[in-house]
Each structure stands twice: as structure tokens, then as C-alpha cells.
Amino acid sequence: MTAESQRAAEGVATAIEAAAETGHHGHGPHGDGKLKLAVGAVGVVFGDIGTSPLYAFRETFAGHHPIEPDRLHIYGVLSLVFWSMMLVVTFKYVMTIMRADNKGEGGSLALLALISRSSEGKRWTWPIVLLGVFATALFYGDSMITPAMSVLSATEGLSYVDKGFEPYIVPIALGILIGLFAIQARGTAKVGALFGPIMLLYFLMLAGLGILHIGNNPWIIVETLNPVNALRFFYLDGFTAFIALGAVVLAVTGAEALYADMGHFGRGPIGLSWLSFVLPALMLNYMGQGAMVLAAEAGPRTELIADPFFQMMPQFLELPVVILALLATIIASQAVISGAFSLTQQAIQLGFMPRLRVEHTSASAAGQIYIPIVNWGLMVMVILLVLGFGSSSNLAAAYGIAVTGAMFIDTCLMSVVLFTLWKWPAWKALPVLAVFFIVDIAYFGANLIKVPDGGWVPLVIGLTIFTLLTTWSRGRKLMQEEMAEGAMPIPIFVKSAANSATRVPGTAVFMTSSSDGVPHALLHNLKHNKVLHERIILLTIKIADVPFVPESKLCQLEDLGQGFHRLVLNYGFMQPIDVPEALMRVTSCGGEFKMLETSFFLSRQTLIAAKKPGMPIWREKLFAWMLRNSESAMEYFRLPSNRVVELGSQVAI
């Protein structure tokens, strides 16, 4: 690892450590009962993994690296699919990683914040920090490929309804995807209630189609559940089995969504819906596809394996099945898009991204957000992927490497949790981690073969976003250090300026990222306007390393004397920030604000790239560009535009 990479990681680590200064709050799912939440989880959490039967089995035997659809390979692949689901989804995520929640929330950034708190700022954590940030970057690549892959795969089913649809598959898929992104600004609260019932019906359809064909070969259930078939596959045809892993992993893509969405439903309901409903439905369908192919003679097998999912359909059910599959892929895509919005908000709050415009699409649900630049950026990339690859089979080559990379990183992060947070002894932790690492490395290695066929796409996307995230975090740290160098201590300023400057009526709020030094905007205001307000509030927004901060810990107000006050507003990394609304509630800590008598003073920095140690010039220029294009503090903190005064300053890093 280069020295520059280490400095970047330390910048990220510092950002997390800075975020880990305020209170803790448990946030868990609430509802009428575990069963209701489990049904809701089916509609949100399992969309990605639920649409895998459309292409996973097919890609093993008819993808870019096809294998012969004989009895050894079919039983071996089915056994690999089942035991992959048991080891990766059930054992790794449901039983282990989902126990490592950050006050009820999951996901790579939540886990990273949890680790930062447990390590208490130790510098040995910088490689783990880098891995966590890279997992976040890989998610964006996955959130571009998933909608393209899933919607294309379902749209291709229209050609089984009527061959006349074949030339229009790509245009229809593009129309659906563009429409999906276009409605994001309106929110999905109204149609979201339909997601659960639709996905329940979809999984029942998967199970029904599977049972229809398993009836011809019931013994396939025993063969699938028998791990000996997977081991025999590797023993008799090891290289082919390794190649097959690259496609088998498509059956578990979306496993990380169980952890990421844990805050909405809870570990118990997600585990219940997985083990009692989703897993059986998926496996029945995979076994049905295998039974159908095995029942055919050698010649027809080649035709069936070209698209086994849609070949399972009875003719009279073709259109309903295709429509239901299409709805399921739209719901899966929606979940990924919403996940990208949520992850972006967390990244902004934790200091990994510049301020971006965040719109709240629901008055009742704080989690319903819309980020325009993320939405349109994803849409452009999804369109390019659909046009560039042209079919779900081609896209499958690009799919998997980002997911397996993220799964490997989750295991790395989990190893830190086991040893430093849970204090597991080596004899207990090492066998668990050994299983996780062996499975993850095998899948990641098998997917590396796909790099020339399209696997490079998510890697390039991930590396690009990783560069942006670490550049912003490092640049922000350098800028804050530069501004803090010449900052005057607040007590000295209060004593020297309070009596000498002319005081005018009203309240002035000066926003500052540091609660120690005098804000630059205050110094500039005094220098140019020669006055101070009767009441001066030095306001700092602090983001905790927990998702939600309770009302009782919203603020701390300190009287500094001479009409000066220090006010700290505390937020969790998943809470929306609304400064005027918060100021109306600070009466709980002894303050009272009249908005019509309050002015907000902000400092807007202009960055000058200089040949100083810290970052290469190209990264300084990249950081300066990100700073210029970030959302203004006035809009991000929802300050009233007619009460805001902006004062500029130049900073060289």
C-alpha cells in the first residue's frame, strides 16, 4: 500500500473518529408483530436474491463459461447453490454478521462506524477503514448493474410469449428503467405497500413452478441437499467446478441486502422470512429447473438450458409469469436505488462525501429520501450498461465481482468485530472466519475469470468512487487543519472583542465545524462590518457514530459570557438535518430563538491547490472541484435564504 493511500485512509479514519463523539441510541424496527415485519421484509429485502432464478442456473450452463448439463454437473451445481445459500446467507449473514448491528442499523458504513468506536481511534485500523470505504464504493457499481441485469432478464421472457417482442426487448427494458428513475422524485410510499404482496405472490410462483417439475424427479431434493454431490463435483472435475462458482454466486447476490436493510425490519423478522419462506421457494425453483433439464434427452437439454426459468412455464401461464417476474425485478431495482440514496446520506453525514441535495419525499417516514444527482447518475450508467451489453447473459459477466468483493470485505470487517468488540477467543473465532474466508476467496477468484468479459466494469466504477470518497475525506481533513492553524481561541476573543465592538440588536448564528476556535465568518464580519450582535451563537453540527440520536441528547448549550453561547446539535448518521427546526426545540437545553430576529452567517471556502505535503496536485484539484459543486450550507441545513449572510475565504492546502 502506498504512503499516499495510507494518508488517505488516516483521513477517513479521522473523519469517523470525529463522528464518534456523541451519544448512543438504540433504533429498532417497530410494528404489529414479527410476522407482519417478516412479510414486509419479503417485499424489500429479498428482491435482489429473489430474482436470481431468472438467470443464475442458466448462466452456469449457457453463459460465457458454460459447462456440460449432465447429471454430475447438474446435481453438483444444485448442491453448490443450496450450500452456498446456507453458508453465505444463513450462517454468515443471518446468524453472524447481522448480530453486529450499530444501534439496530446494518450496512458497511454502519459496521465501519461501529469498528471505529471499538478501536478507539487506533491507527492500526486504517487498512480496515480503506476496505470499508471500498465496499461502499463497490455497492454503487452493484446498484448500477442490478437494475440493468434484473429488468433485462425479465423483459427477455416476453420473447417466449411472442417472438415478435424479440427486437424490442432492449427498448422495452430501457423504457421501464427510465420510467423507474423518473418517478423517484415523487417517492414510493404510495406504491410501497404493494411490494410485499407482489413479492409474496412472486415467491409462491417460484415454488409452484419448481414443484411442477420436481414431481417428475422427487429424488432431486435428496441429491441437492446432499453436500457429497458438491464435493464429488470438485473431486471429479475440479476446474469445471471452480468455473461454475462464478455463475453459482449469482444465486446469492443480494445477501448483503439482508444486513443493509436490517434497520427497517430487524434481524428476527428477516431471518424468519428467509428460513421459512424465501429459501424454500428459491430452492424449489432451482431444483425444478434442474429436474426439467434432467428429464429431457441430451439434444433438447441444450435448448432448455438456454433459458430454463421461462421454459418451466406452462403455456397458459406464460404472460402472467413474465409480468410477475417483471414486477419483481422492478421492485428489486427500487430496493437497490433506495439503498443507494440511503448509503449516500450516511456517507455525507460521516464525512465521506460532499454535501448533496437531499429531498424528503414523505412527511411521515424520515427514511424516504431522494438525491437527484445520485438518481440521474445511476440512470445514465444503467442505460449505458443496457446498451453496451445488450442482454442479461452478457451483463452476467459483469455481475458478481462487485458482490463477491463486498462479501469478502464484510468478512474482513467482521473479523475485527469478533476479536475487538465481541472479544471472541481465537479457538472460537478462527474456525468461523476460516469458513467465511474460504468461501469468499473461492467465489471472488472464480469471478476474476470474468474480468475480460465485463467484470472490469464494476471494478472501474468502484475504484473511481473509492478515489472520490477518500479524496474528499482526506481533503476535508487537510482543509480543517489549515483553518484551525490560525484560529483564535474563543475565550480570548470573547474577552477582547466583546467590549470593544459595537453591539447591535438581534441574534447571529455562526456555523462552524470546530467547537474550539472562532469561526472565520465571525472574524470576517467583525473586520468588515465592525459590529457584533447582542446575542452570538457559535453553532456546531456533530454527527454521531450511531444512526439516531434521542431527543434528550439533541443539543448542548453553553454560556460563554458577554452574550456569546456555544451550541452543539447532535444527529445520527441516518437523521435528516434541519437547523431552523432544531433551534425551535432547543428550549430543552435552555435556549430560545425567534427566527425573524436571527441571522445566519456562513463561511464559504475557495480552495487554492498548493504544493504542500498532504495530497498530490491532481487530488487537490479534484477536491477543489468537489467542494465547488457541493450543496451550499444554506440549502443543506435548510436555512431561510432571507436570513443568511455568506462570507468568503481562501484556503490553501
Swiss-Prot record:
Cellular component terms per the entry's GO annotation: plasma membrane
Main location: membrane
UniProt entry tagged with the keyword Transmembrane: yes
Location of the protein in the cell: Cell inner membrane
Chain ranges passing through the membrane: 37-57, 74-94, 125-145, 165-185, 191-211, 233-253, 268-288, 321-341, 369-389, 401-421, 429-449, 451-471
Keyword set, alphabetical order: Cell inner membrane, Cell membrane, Ion transport, Membrane, Potassium, Potassium transport, Symport, Transmembrane, Transmembrane helix, Transport
InterPro entries hit by this protein: K+_transporter, K_trans_C, K_trans_N, Kup
Catalytic activity reported: K(+)(in) + H(+)(in) = K(+)(out) + H(+)(out)
GO molecular function (one): potassium ion transmembrane transporter activity
Membrane topology, from the record: Multi-pass membrane protein
Function summary: Transport of potassium into the cell. Likely operates as a K(+):H(+) symporter.
Assigned protein family: Belongs to the HAK/KUP transporter (TC 2.A.72) family.
HAMAP family, sorted: Kup
The protein's name: Probable potassium transport system protein Kup
Organism of provenance: Sphingopyxis alaskensis (strain DSM 13593 / LMG 18877 / RB2256) (Sphingomonas alaskensis)
